[in-house]
C-alpha cells in the first residue's frame, strides 16, 4: 500500500523511545504487535488504576513515576523493581506507575525495535470518560503492510481494563471515530460540530483542563510526536490558555488528519517557533507543580 507517511522514518528510535543501556532486555521480544502491547501493559499500571487492580499505589510513585520522560529511565525503574525479563508480567506493586503516554511510548519502542514502524498519536478518546466527553489520551499508531497505519491502545491490552471501559472494538484497531487525533478534534470544534469543553482531561464541572486551548495544546503535542519528539503530556510551550491563535493549529490539522503529509509536517515543526518543541519546556506537573525542564 503506497503512503505519503514515509513509514521508514518511524523505524528508528527517538531520544525518548530509545531503551539505551537496557537494549539487551529487548532480545526476547516477539514480533507480533498485539503481544507487544500486552507485554507493555503487564509492566505498567496507570496511576488511576489502583482500585481496578485492587492495589494502593504509594504516594511517591503516584507523584513521581510519570514524570519520567525517557524510556531508558522508565526501563530502569521497571527492572529495579523486578529484574525478570520484560516478557514476565509484573505484580501491580512492582509496575511502573504511568499514564497513557508511557504505555504508548513503551509499545512504540518495542515495535520500532522489531522492525514495525510506529509513532505516538495525541488526541481524545470517547471511551474513557462520561458519555459525550472526549478524554485526553495517547495511542500508538503502527504500520500494517496490508492496511497501512492502524491505531492501537495498549492501555486496553488487559481485558480487565477493556471491560471496565466497555469497549466494543479491537484495541489493536481502534476506530478513528472513537479516538480522534488532536487535529481532527481541533477541526471538529472549529466547525462547531462539538463543544470545545467536551474535550480535555475532565468535563468542565470537574475542573478547568478542557476547551479550545487544551485541544490546541494536544494538537501541538501530536505534531511533536509525529516528529518523534514524544514529550510528557504536561510539557508546554507556545501559546498560553488565554491566547489561542487559530491559524497555526488549522495548518497542523490540515497536515495531520488522514494521511500525514510528513515532509510538510516536519517543515512546519522545524520552522514555526510556537509549534516547535524548544530545548527548555515549562512542565506543569500535576502533583509537583510547574518547573522549567531542559530536554536531552
Model-derived features: positions:
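His-Asp-centered catalytic microenvironments across diverse enzyme cores
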Residues: 2-15, 37-47, 54-60, 79, ...
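Generic N-terminal amphipathic, Lys/Arg-enriched alpha-helix
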Residues: 14-23
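Asp/Glu-centered strand-loop micro-motifs enriched in Gly/Pro and often flanked by an aromatic residue
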Residues: 24-29, 93-94
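Functionally constrained cores in energy, signaling, and assembly domains
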Residues: 24-25, 33, 107-110, 139-144
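N-terminal, Lys/Arg-enriched amphipathic/low-complexity engagement segments
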Residues: 27-87
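Generic structural signal for short, solvent-exposed loop/turn connectors between secondary structure elements
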Residues: 31, 144-146, 296
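Active-site neighborhood of thiol-dependent amide/isopeptide-bond enzymes
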Residues: 63-138
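A eukaryote-biased signal for long
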Residues: 283-296
Amino acid at each position: 500500500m503506497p503512503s505519503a507517511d514515509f513509514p521508514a522514518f518511524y523505524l528508528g528510535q527517538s531520544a525518548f523511545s530509545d531503551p539505551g543501556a537496557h537494549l539487551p532486555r529487548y532480545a526476547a521480544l516477539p514480533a507480533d504487535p498485539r503481544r507487544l502491547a500486552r507485554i507493555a501493559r503487564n509492566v505498567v499500571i496507570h496511576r488511576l488504576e489502583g482500585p481496578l487492580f485492587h492495589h494502593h499505589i504509594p504516594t511517591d510513585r503516584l507523584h513521581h513515576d510519570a514524570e519520567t520522560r525517557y524510556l531508558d529511565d522508565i526501563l530502569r525503574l521497571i527492572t529495579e523493581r523486578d529484574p525478570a525479563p520484560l516478557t514476565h508480567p509484573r505484580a501491580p506493586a512492582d509496575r511502573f506507575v504511568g499514564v497513557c503516554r508511557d504505555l504508548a511510548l513503551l509499545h512504540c519502542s518495542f515495535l520500532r525495535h522489531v522492525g514495525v514502524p510506529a509513532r505516538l498519536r495525541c488526541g481524545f478518546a470517547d471511551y474513557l470518560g462520561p458519555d459525550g466527553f472526549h478524554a485526553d489520551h495517547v495511542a500508538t499508531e503502527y504500520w500494517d503492510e496490508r492496511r497501512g497505519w492502524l491505531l492501537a491502545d495498549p492501555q486496553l491490552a488487559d481485558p480487565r481494563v477493556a471491560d471496565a471501559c466497555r469497549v466494543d472494538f479491537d484495541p489493536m484497531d481502534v476506530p478513528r471515530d472513537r479516538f480522534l487525533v488532536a487535529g481532527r478534534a481541533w477541526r471538529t470544534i472549529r466547525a462547531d460540530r462539538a463543544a470545545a469543553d467536551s474535550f480535555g482531561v475532565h468535563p468542565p464541572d470537574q475542573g478547568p483542563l478542557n476547551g479550545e486551548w487544551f485541544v490546541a495544546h494536544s494538537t501541538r503535542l501530536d505534531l511533536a510526536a509525529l516528529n518523534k519528539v514524544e514529550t510528557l503530556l504536561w510539557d508546554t510551550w507556545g501559546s498560553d490558555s488565554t491566547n489561542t491563535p487559530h491559524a497555526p493549529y488549522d495548518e497542523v490539522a490540515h497536515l495531520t488528519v488522514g494521511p500525514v503529509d510528513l515532509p510538510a509536517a516536519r517543515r512546519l515543526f522545524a520552522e514555526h517557533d510556537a509549534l516547535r518543541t524548544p530545548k527548555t519546556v515549562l512542565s506543569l506537573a500535576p502533583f509537583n507543580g510547574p518547573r522549567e525542564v531542559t530536554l536531552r
